Amino acid sequence: MAASVLNTLLRRLPMLSLFRGAHRVQVPLQTLCTKPPSEEDSLSPVPISPYKDEPWKYLESEEYQERYGSRPVWADYRRNHKGGVPPQRTRKTCIRGNKVAGNPCPICRDHKLHVDFRNVKLLEQFVCAHTGIIFHSLYTGVCVKQHKRLTQAIQKARDHGLLIYHIPQVEPRDRDFSISHGAVSATPPAPTLISGDPWYPWYNWKQPPERELSRLRRLYQGHLREESGPPPESMPKMPPTAPAEASFTGQTDPQSAL
């Protein structure tokens, strides 16, 4: 029994010595009192653009010409996505606080570009020159936030008369816009109505053959009163009856039937 207790103490002796050695380490008070740097301080802030008040001057500078040239700012941009099929909408925003997402959109990647209704040269790059339609965000690659700002700035620039678009005039073709076509002109009357013939040919009177007439005479001998000629040109018109007389006759007919 005593041997087992002694072995247990010998096993725990090195652990106790290490624990005591750890307490003997001196830690300076300065390291314990200083605050750890916050995430906002550790991250580099977004640089401030010198063209914030006058953003149109950046598009006239040599720096812009060296970087973009005569092409739009979104010409060389390629979206970064997972898989072979790109998502059907761009990201909501590229900058959240001081954090800039990887591969930001063409507007967010250059801090000197500012969406403003007075920056006409920048807005013209996102509008079709032929139709005046704003390019879709999937075509230009800008995020949803910047696309919304672009749409508002373009509409405001049009209201102020700064941004206009020209639609070329196309001369209409005579064949497409002619009013002499049969489908758009007055319908002429049928030739049969002009000549006085009936609309359908089987309504016209035709003299039956003499052989057929002789057969019918033999068949209905003694029952035929007289031979009828061609039908009259116009049927006799019946005199119109007054509504009161018609209602009176309609009421008296059932009584007479009884």
UniProtKB/Swiss-Prot annotation:
<protein>
    <recommendedName>
        <fullName>Small ribosomal subunit protein mS40</fullName>
    </recommendedName>
</protein>
<feature type="transit peptide" description="Mitochondrion">
    <location>
        <begin position="1"/>
        <end position="35"/>
    </location>
</feature>
<feature type="compositionally biased region" description="Pro residues">
    <location>
        <begin position="229"/>
        <end position="242"/>
    </location>
</feature>
<dbReference type="GO" id="GO:0030054">
    <property type="term" value="C:cell junction"/>
</dbReference>
<dbReference type="GO" id="GO:0005763">
    <property type="term" value="C:mitochondrial small ribosomal subunit"/>
</dbReference>
<dbReference type="GO" id="GO:0005654">
    <property type="term" value="C:nucleoplasm"/>
</dbReference>
<feature type="modified residue" description="Phosphoserine">
    <location>
        <position position="49"/>
    </location>
</feature>
<keyword id="KW-0597">Phosphoprotein</keyword>
<keyword id="KW-0496">Mitochondrion</keyword>
<feature type="region of interest" description="Disordered">
    <location>
        <begin position="218"/>
        <end position="258"/>
    </location>
</feature>
<feature type="modified residue" description="Phosphoserine">
    <location>
        <position position="38"/>
    </location>
</feature>
<dbReference type="InterPro" id="IPR040054">
    <property type="entry name" value="MRPS18B"/>
</dbReference>
<keyword id="KW-0687">Ribonucleoprotein</keyword>
<dbReference type="Pfam" id="PF01084">
    <property type="entry name" value="Ribosomal_S18"/>
</dbReference>
<dbReference type="GO" id="GO:0032543">
    <property type="term" value="P:mitochondrial translation"/>
</dbReference>
<comment type="subunit">
    <text>Component of the mitochondrial ribosome small subunit (28S) which comprises a 12S rRNA and about 30 distinct proteins.</text>
</comment>
<dbReference type="GO" id="GO:0003735">
    <property type="term" value="F:structural constituent of ribosome"/>
</dbReference>
<dbReference type="InterPro" id="IPR036870">
    <property type="entry name" value="Ribosomal_bS18_sf"/>
</dbReference>
<dbReference type="InterPro" id="IPR001648">
    <property type="entry name" value="Ribosomal_bS18"/>
</dbReference>
<feature type="compositionally biased region" description="Polar residues">
    <location>
        <begin position="248"/>
        <end position="258"/>
    </location>
</feature>
<comment type="similarity">
    <text>Belongs to the bacterial ribosomal protein bS18 family. Mitochondrion-specific ribosomal protein mS40 subfamily.</text>
</comment>
<keyword id="KW-0809">Transit peptide</keyword>
<dbReference type="GO" id="GO:0005739">
    <property type="term" value="C:mitochondrion"/>
</dbReference>
<keyword id="KW-0689">Ribosomal protein</keyword>
